[in-house]
Amino acid sequence: MKSWWPKALKVRRAEGQPVIPDVASASTPARFRGKPKIDFSRCPDGCAACVEVCPTGAISANPLTIDLGACIFCPVCTETCPEGAIAYTNDYKMAATSREDLLLREGCEITPEACSREIRRLFGRSLKLRSVSAGGCNGCELELNALGNVNFDMGRFGIEFIASPRHADAIVISGTTTQAMAHALEATFEAVPKPKLIILFGACAISGGIFQDSDQLARDFIEKHRVDLYIPGCPPHPLTFIHGLLEYLRKSDPAPAAGAQLLPAVSPSLWNLTPLKSPPC
C-alpha cells in the first residue's frame, strides 16, 4: 500500500500558503463584484435607466447615488447603463460606522471611523461575537462560517463566534429581521452584558434587501438601537467583515491627554505561549 503523504505534500506545495496574511492588502478574484465605481462624467443629465431597473431601489439620481446598504451587487445597473458609467471593482473594503456613509456619491469615501478609546481598551485584543440569523437565506451565514476556516482565520485577531450571548461582546445580525425572529433577537441582545456592540451583516440586515417591502418584517429593533458597524454585501465577503472590524477597533484616536493610561500594543511574542501544565489530581 502506497503512503499517502508524498501526494499530500505535493498538493500542499502546489496550493501555496492557504492563510491570508494581511487582510488589508489581500486580493479578490476578478469576477468578484465589490464596491461600485461611478464615472460621473459619463452620466448624462436626465438619464434614469439604472434607477428604473434597480431591484432594491438602491440607486437614486440627481445626484447619482448608490446606497450600498440596499445594493445586492447584481449586474443589472452595469448592463443597463447606456454610457457604462457604473462598474464594479474588486474592492472589498466597504464597511462603515454610519448608515449615511454607505451612500456612494461623488467625492465621498467609505471608511469606518475609529471606535472610542474605551471600546478599544475593552475589545481591542479579544472580541466575542454572537451570530443571530433573523430571517436570512443562509447566504450571509455561510460567509460568517467561512471566517473561521484556514483561509481567513479570524481567531488569530482575537475575534471569534461563541454560542452563549451572555459570554458575548457583540451580536452580528444577518437576515431581514422578521416578525418571527423579533422576540428572539431582542432577548439575545438583552442577554449580552454591557457594553455591547451591534453589527449588521448584509443588505437584508441593513435595509431589508429585496424583501424590504414585505409585511412580515419587523425592523423596530434596528430603528431603536444604535448600530456600531455596517457590513454591506449580498452576501458580504469575509474580508469585508474582517477588514471593517479591524479598522473599527484599531484605528488611532486623537492624541490622548497628558498622563492618560492606554492599552499597550500587542507584542507578537504574546502569541507564542507555552501550554499550561495540568494541575495534579
Predicted regions and their residues:
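C-terminal functional extensions of proteins
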Residues: 213-281
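Flanking helices and flexible, charged tails adjoining ferredoxin-like Fe-S electron-transfer domains
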Residues: 1-6, 10-17, 23, 79-165, ...
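Generic secondary-structure signature for well-ordered alpha-helical cores
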Residues: 55, 121-124, 142, 149, ...
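A common structural microfeature
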Residues: 33-35, 126, 169
